């Protein structure tokens, strides 16, 4: 069964513990369900496995979590929708295909509100003509996934100036509200619709 669970606003540690608990249960076969956890985080930086010291400039009093996902450092905060799929992928679905599907969820969501978004060669995430609107960083072990994707709705971009987001020096971060007026709860509903449609192809 595919379950969509809205955690509301969370501290990063809380959401990480939920993911890890379900992830371990799925690895052992104790949990046969598949989950998309949705949240907004209180301010936090997360640093993936390719983070270099020069990618973190000055995070001041905001915590930094070094975690086991792909990618470099990013910021999470209010005004950003974060989606954590904890899934058992169908046989033969590659990590590349899985990431493609997560990106597709975002591309189709923002297309509904008139934003043209796309992928870039050799980069993960979703981009627009005004900058990067969504980041992707995942871990897949024995076909089970964790971590995920974050979509910027109206997040405070100043926090991204304290890091080199995703290790990309020359592409700014952008919000949905750089293009159109947007209510985060309405965007979330559109996102969930595409999560259900695309997510069923993965499990």
UniProtKB/Swiss-Prot annotation:
Enzyme Commission number, as recorded: 2.3.1.181
Active site, UniProt feature: 166 (acyl-thioester intermediate)
Binding site for substrate: 69-76, 135-137, 148-150
Keyword tags: Acyltransferase, Cytoplasm, Transferase
PROSITE patterns per the UniProt record, alphabetical: BPL_LPL_CATALYTIC (PS51733), LIPB (PS01313)
Tree of life domain: Bacteria
Site (Lowers pKa of active site Cys): 132
MF annotations from Gene Ontology: lipoyl(octanoyl) transferase activity
Functional pathway: Protein modification; protein lipoylation via endogenous pathway; protein N(6)-(lipoyl)lysine from octanoyl-[acyl-carrier-protein]: step 1/2
Main location: cytoplasm
Subcellular location: Cytoplasm
The BPL/LPL catalytic domain, residue ranges: 30-203
Function: Catalyzes the transfer of endogenously produced octanoic acid from octanoyl-acyl-carrier-protein onto the lipoyl domains of lipoate-dependent enzymes. Lipoyl-ACP can also act as a substrate although octanoyl-ACP is likely to be the physiological substrate.
Remaining remarks: In the reaction, the free carboxyl group of octanoic acid is attached via an amide linkage to the epsilon-amino group of a specific lysine residue of lipoyl domains of lipoate-dependent enzymes.
Protein's UniProt name: Octanoyltransferase
Species classification: Bacteria, Pseudomonadati, Aquificota, Aquificia, Aquificales
Annotated gene: lipB
């Amino acid at each position: 069964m595919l379950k969509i669970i809205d955690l509301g606003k969370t501290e990063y540690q809380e959401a990480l513990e939920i993911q890890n608990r379900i992830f371990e249960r799925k690895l052992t076969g104790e949990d046969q369900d598949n989950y998309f956890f949705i949240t907004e985080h209180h301010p936090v930086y997360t640093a993936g496995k390719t983070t270099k010291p020069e990618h973190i400039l000055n995070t001041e009093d905001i915590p930094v979590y070094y975690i086991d996902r792909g990618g470099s450092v990013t910021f999470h905060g209010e005004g950003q929708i974060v989606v954590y799929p904890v899934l058992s992928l169908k046989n033969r679905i590659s990590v590349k295909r899985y990431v493609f599907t997560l990106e597709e969820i975002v591309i189709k969501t923002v297309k509904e509100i008139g934003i043209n978004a796309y992928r870039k060669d050799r980069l993960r995430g979703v981009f627009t003509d005004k900058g990067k609107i969504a980041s992707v960083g995942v871990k897949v072990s024995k076909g089970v996934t964790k971590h995920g994707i974050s979509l910027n709705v109206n997040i405070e971009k100043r926090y991204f100036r304290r890091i080199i987001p995703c290790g990309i020096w020359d592409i700014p971060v952008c919000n949905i509200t750089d293009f159109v007026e947007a209510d985060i709860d309405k965007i979330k509903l559109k996102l969930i619709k595409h999560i259900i449609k695309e997510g069923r192809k993965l499990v």
